[in-house]
């Protein structure tokens, strides 16, 4: 019952031993990979049903379970098998287990998937156990299983072979179970708030809704270059124009052909929603309710640990304008600065290198990123962004250089981005033309106007608040995961030979 064997008829190589056992099993029992196996309950259901069974107690209850063999003792007399819900001990002995079933034990290796039928008992030591009466080979594993209690030492192997990571690392398994719970809770929260879920194109003839480098592909039949979407925004706004619903959301993948880091993966999950007849103030309240709901779903409380920090998702969150935050950090009063050159010089005087053609708003945003962002540990809304980096947001009344936009930060990370959405079609066209010209100046010659979206805006979009949430980063916070690779099942990796 190990990856080494004393049987002189078998190879000493663990992989070869398994291959030889597979051959013997095929000869002895036929189908080693049956199409179906009926179990009467999961391991967790078994544990719950018999939680009050006293030690050293036997029952006449016959059950059938299945799972992967994780450990074996006394030549297979005791085995621990795991399904997705938990562990159960299996006991095989000549007094309780027929010879035919015991005859299978030498053929079972760690990592094999087996089915067991037997009687439930609890041992003197209090271990819930099944006295095996029948053992069925369901899947013969041809590769040795990583050691359960040492896990995978190589972090790259954990990412490249996630199935092994989850198989031997309970923390990884729990993390991805929590991810599923968070996404389900997010969807349920939005539905309870009255939002309708829709699906918009992942393949788009014109990319838009954000400033990012897209992945490009080609549709052979349509003879059309297309792009994996960088954002669903322009399609979700079309939904608002249509009148299908006043509250719309989508949870799905976005793709950006850009850098990879502990917070960035080229394929990532976003939630975007749009709320007609609301503004960014309303959306701030929505974010606070959302964060509180998700923290309660995962932790049962709004207080939880991330690394060495104690975070609180209990609203309301503090609010600070971007110009005020930068002034507090640097002493530079951007609202008193009148020109782009004056803004650039102020940055240089503060010891910050800036692009020679950076605008007033770009300088303000850059200084915020450099001097403020990392200090925002507890959740906070940063409001009033520069208009020249926010082409889809309404102006702040009385301050035409700023817009009604906020980003929600936590642990120094941007988690959410929201606007009072621009719905003036004339102004929208002007800003998108300017955005396109800036893209062309950066060498993005393929960037074009989305005339269909602008036609939709001409039909009239109601006033609305819009929100995008980086679901992966939010999950990182809620699961105490320092890297985005820890919460994406199969993150993008460089080819192993590179």
From Swiss-Prot:
Residue numbers binding Mg(2+) 2 = 414
Pfam families in UniProt? tRNA-synt_2 (PF00152), tRNA_anti-codon (PF01336)
> Where along the sequence do coiled-coil regions lie?
none
Q: What class of enzyme is it?
A: ligase
Task: Quote the subcellular location field of this record.
Answer: Cytoplasm
The cofactors it requires, by name, are: Mg(2+)
Protein's UniProt name: Lysine--tRNA ligase
Organism for this UniProt entry: Sinorhizobium medicae (strain WSM419) (Ensifer medicae)
Q: What is the lineage of its organism?
A: Bacteria, Pseudomonadati, Pseudomonadota, Alphaproteobacteria, Hyphomicrobiales
Question: Could you tell me the gene encoding this protein?
Answer: lysS
């Amino acid at each position: 019952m190990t990856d080494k064997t004393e049987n002189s008829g078998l190879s000493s190589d663990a992989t070869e031993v398994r291959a030889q056992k597979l051959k013997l099993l095929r000869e002895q029992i036929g189908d080693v990979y049956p199409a179906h196996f009926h179990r009467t309950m999961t391991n967790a259901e078994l544990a719950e049903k018999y939680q009050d069974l006293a030690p050293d107690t036997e029952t006449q209850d016959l059950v059938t379970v299945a799972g992967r063999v994780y450990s074996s003792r006394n030549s297979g007399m005791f085995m621990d098998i795991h399904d997705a819900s938990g562990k159960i001990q299996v006991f095989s002995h000549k007094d309780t287990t027929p010879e035919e079933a015991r005859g299978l034990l030498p053929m079972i290796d760690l990592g094999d998937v087996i089915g067991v039928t037997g009687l439930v008992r609890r041992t003197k030591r209090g271990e819930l156990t099944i006295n095996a009466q029948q053992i069925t080979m369901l899947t013969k594993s041809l590769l040795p299983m990583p050691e359960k209690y040492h896990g995978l030492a190589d972090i790259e192997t954990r990412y490249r072979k996630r199935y092994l990571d989850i198989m031997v690392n309970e923390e990884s398994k729990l993390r991805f179970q929590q991810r599923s719970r968070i996404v389900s809770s997010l969807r349920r929260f939005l539905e309870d708030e009255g939002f309708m879920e829709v699906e918009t194109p992942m393949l788009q003839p014109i990319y838009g809704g954000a400033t990012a480098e897209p992945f490009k592909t080609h549709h052979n039949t349509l003879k059309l270059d297309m792009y994996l979407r960088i954002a669903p925004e322009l399609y979700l706004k079309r939904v608002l124009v249509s009148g299908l619903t006043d509250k719309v959301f989508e949870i799905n993948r976005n793709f950006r052909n850009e850098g990879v880091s502990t917070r960035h993966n080229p394929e990532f999950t976003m939630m975007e929603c749009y709320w007609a007849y609301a503004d960014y103030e309303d959306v701030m309240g929505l974010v606070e309710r959302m964060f509180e709901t998700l923290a309660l779903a995962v932790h049962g409380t709004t207080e939880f640990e991330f690394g060495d920090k104690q975070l609180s998702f209990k609203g309301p969150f503090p609010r600070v304008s971007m110009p005020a935050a930068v002034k507090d950090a640097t002493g530079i009063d951007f609202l008193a600065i009148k020109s782009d050159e004056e803004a650039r010089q102020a940055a240089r005087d503060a010891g910050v290198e800036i692009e020679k053609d950076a605008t007033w708003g770009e300088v303000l945003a850059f200084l915020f990123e450099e001097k403020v962002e990392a200090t925002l540990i507890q959740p906070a809304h940063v409001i009033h962004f520069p208009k020249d980096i926010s082409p889809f947001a309404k102006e702040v009344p009385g301050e035409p250089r700023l817009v009604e936009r906020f980003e929600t930060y936590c642990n120094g990370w941007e988690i959410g981005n929201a606007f009072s959405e621009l719905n003036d079609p004339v102004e929208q066209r002007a800003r998108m033309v300017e955005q396109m010209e800036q893209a062309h100046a950066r060498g993005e010659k393929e960037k074009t106007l989305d005339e269909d979206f602008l036609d939709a805006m001409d039909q009239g979009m109601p006033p609305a608040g819009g929100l995008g949430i980086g679901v992966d980063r939010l999950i990182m916070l809620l699961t105490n995961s320092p890297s985005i690779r820890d919460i994406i099942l199969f993150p993008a990796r460089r080819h192993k030979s590179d």
